Amino acid sequence: MDYKYIIKKIDQIIDQKPKVCLILGSGLNDFCNQLKNQKKINYSDINCFKKNKIEGHSKEFVFGYINKIPILVANGRLHYYEGYTFEEVGVLIKVFNYYKPSKYIITNSTGTVNKDWSIGDFMITQKFLDFSFIKNNKHRYYYLKNQINIKNKKLHYGTYTYTIGPTYETKTEIEEIKFLGGDVVGMSTFPEYMMCNYLKINPIILSCITNYAAGIESTPVKHSHVINNAKKSKLNFIKLLTEIVLLQNNT
């Protein structure tokens, strides 16, 4: 995937280099409504991207301002399960890195295995648990530099567990993930983090908890529930993400 071509297309809609670059996860696209003087380009207008359409992902780049801070948003991410390689999923980070922003933010919608946490809560990732078994048959941990310290009763700090998807985990898998120390489970973000790691970037990773993982509750997990619960959390999510955007530069 030619990231330089993607940059060339983005340069057609921006009037200055972004100081904040961020990726929005499933159902979290309402944050873009906060941006002033918006300019957009659809992924479909950039020939590098597949034509896949996943509910909750708008698949567009949006440029705009919050408090005069220029922000570039990837409104909708790529996934390994769509047929992209890890490196291709990480292309959004390579694009962001070209602009050398002061802050990289990656967001996602996740399920939690922690019964003490509630749907509508949020989590900052401090550690990854790779539960994909793509490269070998063992799980592995990756530790992040903790960049922010926001006090919010709905905000937690913990471990993001990466699984391949697109199917949700079994009850047995969730029990093992909990035993291994996972707090939330998702099908994204880890490939982008690996590109950040390669480029020596310290991202802020924010999860919106949209459901309990399989087996925690009696009702089955559905993507439609994830989207609906993300929408219900949108006001708190927008408030928290805006607070993170406006924090002093810390990368």
Residue ranges and their predicted role:
Residues 214-251:
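His/Asp/Glu-rich mid-to-C-terminal helical/loop segments that flank catalytic regions of hydrolases
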Residues 1-139:
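Metabolite-binding pocket within alpha/beta catalytic cores that recognizes anionic/polar moieties
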Residues 96-100, 178, 197:
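Non-catalytic positions within long, well-ordered alpha-helices that form the structural scaffold/packing
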Residues 102-103, 183, 202:
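Short acidic/polar active-site loop segments enriched in Thr and Asp
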Residues 141-150, 164, 171-174, 230-242:
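Polyanion-binding loop/helix "lid" in catalytic or ligand-binding cores
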Residues 187-225:
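Zn-dependent metallopeptidase/amidohydrolase metal-coordination segment
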Residues 93, 174, 190-193:
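Generic hydrophobic/aromatic pocket-lining and core-packing "Φ" positions
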Residues 148-186:
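Active-site/ligand-binding-proximal alpha/beta "capping" segment
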